[in-house]
Amino acid sequence: ADGSLTGQRNDVVLAGLNHKCGWRGTTNTLLNFGECGGAVGYLVGKHGEGLRCMFHMMNEARIGVGMGATMLGYAGYEASLAYAKDRPQGRPMGQGGKDATQPQIPIIRHADVKRMLLAQKSYCEGALALELYCARLVDEAHTGAPDDAAQAALLLEMLTPIAKSWPSEWCLEANSLAIQVHGGYGYTRDFPVEQYWRDNRLNMIHE
């Protein structure tokens, strides 16, 4: 195919929609190629250069995916922190055990809830530090002095897969902990934390 117009439709057919766990605000489709005679493909760029160009694009996308995972983790942390400050459960401990004469305390004063909140905070702040460092390396690789730029590019090449994979795994764990802090409410659509988990689950899969 030389790119000239023939008046005929290319044999690419929209076969249906994929019904996803998360990211329901974006459409994801299934395409069939060449089932009725053959689809025509067009070369973009030079022969043998496609994979190199794709990886150049994907390396930038990986940092973006890691940042997206981090922000979803942070959103869950902020939601569960606010909930833990507001949700009363249990009585304060006195010398003889729980003091039934005292008002209930917010669950943020429970040791296990504190643990889950601090774990979320640690995962998300660590992930954010990594993403911002990679963003700085991108700038330095493009604008630094030749030796500094080369060193930044080399370090970025090593860190980019980590900047994608680590936040997408551990900020998803943060989202799971955010659901746990909410208890049964976290499993309902009345609170946003279940959606944060569903949306963040994709970041371990896609790029």
How should these model regions be labeled?
Residues 1-207:
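Internal glycine-rich alpha/beta core junctions
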